[in-house]
A protein has these predicted regions:
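Beta-strand-rich domains and repeat architectures in extracellular enzymes and scaffolds
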Residues: 1-16, 29-57
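Conserved beta-strand positions in repeat-built beta-propeller and related beta-rich domains
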Residues: 2-5, 54-55, 62-66, 105-110, ...
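Structural signal for beta-propeller blades
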Residues: 8-11, 68-70, 111-114, 171-174, ...
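Short loop/turn segments immediately following beta-strands, especially the blade-tip
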Residues: 13-22, 73-78, 118-126, 176-185, ...
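Beta-propeller fold detector
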Residues: 23-32, 81-87, 125-139, 186-193, ...
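Beta-rich, blade/repeat-based domains predominating
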Residues: 32-53, 88-101, 134-160, 193-210, ...
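Aromatic- and glycine-enriched pocket-lining scaffold segments that form the walls
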Residues: 104-184, 189-195
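Blade-level signature of beta-propeller repeat domains, shared across WD40, Kelch, NHL, RCC1
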Residues: 304-340
Length: 340
């Protein structure tokens, strides 16, 4: 997980026992600084995907929001080796997407932008033609709205033909770029308006439907992602919690949203046609629930207020059984957690 320290960002590494509990085994400097958006309370970067793992190439990518850079680590079991620190070609990077040798970083400030890279021999190579300014609205300095008026995540579609950007209140839209094998990234995205929804984070279900957390109504919505780049809503279910911002897939067809304002996790089960067939139980966490990651039958959730990681086992019903928690030094406000 990333602690996003303003004086120097770090990645904290844990060993996982067969029972799912965590033990801290190392801390690695990223070579860059963490950052904090104006108005952020428990989530410094107000994003999903600040730390991303490429399992195929054993590479870990981290944003350094305070120094406009990203770091590349080699993953060697439970050890990391810093390979690169390079520019994000924008202001305040918050999210990274990785797929099949392609990497995109999302910059949040100055209206937002994305920058693409290729991976060569474990190193990132910037692609000049893969930069796009998003042109989103910018919060008035001093308003305290920067953390909501910045984009939240960049993500690939499962087949790699689309690149999705959630814009939160900066655009109230889900923006979809097309990726052509020959011509690369489309010049402009298809902008899918979601008035008042504050689309924050996204993942895909096992059938390829787009799931989006909507922080405005505190809901999880499912969409069909069309070839044209448009999205068609299939379902939307309220969590009945506050500040539903992050979403993570669990075992089978289970999905879990983090509700920062309620310090809780809400479970869902998806159906074959993109219906969110049932809302499972809501489970309390430590204060300031933010990013989450799952591996096997376990789910790990960051608590941004105190710098905690809650440990859960996902039962056959989708319910969460608490295994305990750990307190990570200097991790309050940090975002970005992955398991491999």
């Amino acid at each position: 997980m990333a602690n996003d320290r303003l004086e120097g960002n770090q990645v904290v590494v844990f060993d996982r026992s067969t029972e799912g509990t965590l033990t801290q085994v190392g801390t690695y400097n990223s070579g860059g600084k963490g950052g904090k958006l104006e108005g952020a309370v428990v989530d410094n970067t107000a994003s999903q995907g600040a730390l991303t793992y490429d399992e195929a190439d054993h590479l870990l990518f981290a944003v350094n929001a305070g120094s406009d850079s990203l770091s590349v680590f080699s993953v060697l079991g439970d050890r990391l080796a810093l390979r690169q620190v390079l520019s994000s070609y924008g202001k305040f990077p918050v999210s990274i997407a990785v797929r099949a040798g392609s990497v995109y970083v999302l910059n949040a400030e100055e209206g937002g932008s994305i920058q693409g890279y290729g991976v060569s021999a474990g190193n990132l190579v910037p692609i000049p033609s893969a930069y796009r300014a998003l042109g989103l609205s910018v919060a008035t300095p001093g308003s305290g709205e920067q953390f909501t008026h910045t984009p939240g995540q960049v993500a690939f579609s499962p087949d790699g033909s689309k690149l999705i950007v959630t814009t939160k209140a900066a655009g109230q839209s889900v923006d979809v770029f097309s990726i052509d094998p020959v011509n690369g990234l489309s010049a402009q995205p298809v902008v899918n308006p979601e008035p008042g929804a504050v689309p924050f984070a996204t993942t895909f279900d096992k059938q390829g439907h787009l799931l989006v957390t909507e922080a405005g109504p505190s809901a999880l919505a499912s969409f069909q992602l069309n070839e044209s780049g448009t999205i068609s809503q299939l379902d939307s279910v309220l969590t009945e919690q506050a500040a539903t911002c992050w979403v993570e897939g669990g075992p089978g067809n289970t999905y879990y949203t983090s509700n920062a304002g309620s310090s809780s996790i809400t479970g869902f089960q998806s159906g074959a046609r993109g219906r969110l067939l049932s809302k499972l139980q809501t489970t309390p966490t430590h204060p300031g629930t933010v990013d989450a990651t799952s591996v096997g039958r376990f789910l790990y959730v960051q608590g941004g207020k105190e710098g905690t990681v809650d440990e859960f086992e996902v039962e056959s019903t989708g319910a969460l059984k608490s295994l305990g928690f750990i307190l990570v030094p200097s991790a309050a406000g940090g975002e970005g957690i992955v398991a491999g």
